Swiss-Prot record:
Belongs to the flavin monoamine oxidase family. FIG1 subfamily. N-glycosylated. Its cofactor is FAD. It comes from the Eukaryota. GO terms for molecular function: L-phenylalaine oxidase activity; toxin activity. This is L-amino-acid oxidase. Keywords: Antibiotic, Antimicrobial, Apoptosis, Cytolysis, FAD, Flavoprotein, Hemolysis, Hemostasis impairing toxin, Oxidoreductase, Secreted, Toxin. It catalyses: an L-alpha-amino acid + O2 + H2O = a 2-oxocarboxylate + H2O2 + NH4(+); L-leucine + O2 + H2O = 4-methyl-2-oxopentanoate + H2O2 + NH4(+); L-phenylalanine + O2 + H2O = 3-phenylpyruvate + H2O2 + NH4(+); L-histidine + O2 + H2O = 3-(imidazol-5-yl)pyruvate + H2O2 + NH4(+).
Length: 31
């Protein structure tokens, strides 16, 4: 499974978006 939604700059460094409740696994590479 790949997680590649557009990432808001202020949250791009987080593994979890509090606002959206979206979780990313530790091995997910953020742009």
């Amino acid at each position: 499974i790949k997680f590649e939604p557009p990432l808001p700059p202020k949250k791009a460094h987080k593994k979890f978006w509090e606002d959206d409740g979206i979780y990313y696994p530790p091995n997910h590479n953020f742009p």
